[in-house]
Amino acid sequence: MQREEKQLDMLLEAVLNRLNDLKHSIGVMIHRLETEYETINWPTFLDNFALISSHLTGLMKILSTEIGTPLRNLTVLPLMLTPERDEALLQLTEGRVPIFSHDLAPDYLRTKPDPGAESRQAAHEAKANNLTVEASMKQVAQYNKVISHVWDIISKAKEDWENESSTRPGIQQTSSMADTQALVAAVGLGNGLTAPVGPPTGAGVMIPPAIRQGSPMSAVSPSGNAPMGKMPSGIKTNIKSANQVHPYR
């Protein structure tokens, strides 16, 4: 007797742990659907669904092993029924069951479908059993026709998408290699650059030595007066003539 009770406790503990994992996975999935419905993607949804499915499979596996006494041979009886609010029961069920009364006990402890749902299910099963072979084959043919039509639409859309993807050009080129090389040659070697030709400059405007006319350096200022108090420079200057080839020409 003690062995059977111990096995029953182990079975109930394993079932309870699996149910808690299942409840947590369902809660996480519902929370994501309520808060991340705009950003959740299909792979994430499938991962959550696969996790729930694995918990259900594990639960069914535990129940199918039937460690000790099968649960189907046991009977669950309520120890206390009251129409008043039970705070301990509310805390135990995490706020789901506040009252365990005579009216609610059959619904909570029911192991079979609701009588109304059971009657509707029986009516559907009877209707399916009374269906003739010809009618069933006709419905199957119509179903296959609809499936084929949907398949053709999807295949055509896939083919159009593949054709569009194959004919779509790659990344558009935003630069020209020839222009880049010409720019580098102009900056580094001066290719293609010419000196600007403009009107004669007036007095007092500084002219580059390479463009200035070849003449000996004059110590006379633009105003025509010789500089006063200027020390002679010991650095020799070499004024290039203007007819020399410009390095950027």
UniProtKB/Swiss-Prot annotation:
Transcription listed as a keyword: yes
Compartments reported by the entry: Nucleus
GO biological process: regulation of transcription by RNA polymerase II
GO CC list: core mediator complex; mediator complex
Keywords: Activator, Coiled coil, Nucleus, Transcription, Transcription regulation
Residue spans of biased composition, Polar residues class: 215-224, 235-249
Family as reported in the entry's similarity comment: Belongs to the Mediator complex subunit 8 family.
Domain of life according to the entry: Eukaryota
GO MF annotation: an example: transcription coregulator activity
A family per Pfam: Med8
Name of the coding gene: MED8
Region spans: Disordered: 215-249
Chief location category: nucleus
Intrachain S-S bonds: none
InterPro entries in the record: Mediatior_Med8_fun/met
Function of the protein: Component of the Mediator complex, a coactivator involved in the regulated transcription of nearly all RNA polymerase II-dependent genes. Mediator functions as a bridge to convey information from gene-specific regulatory proteins to the basal RNA polymerase II transcription machinery. Mediator is recruited to promoters by direct interactions with regulatory proteins and serves as a scaffold for the assembly of a functional preinitiation complex with RNA polymerase II and the general transcription factors.
Coiled coil: 1-26
Subunit structure: Component of the Mediator complex.
Name listed for the protein in its UniProt record: Mediator of RNA polymerase II transcription subunit 8
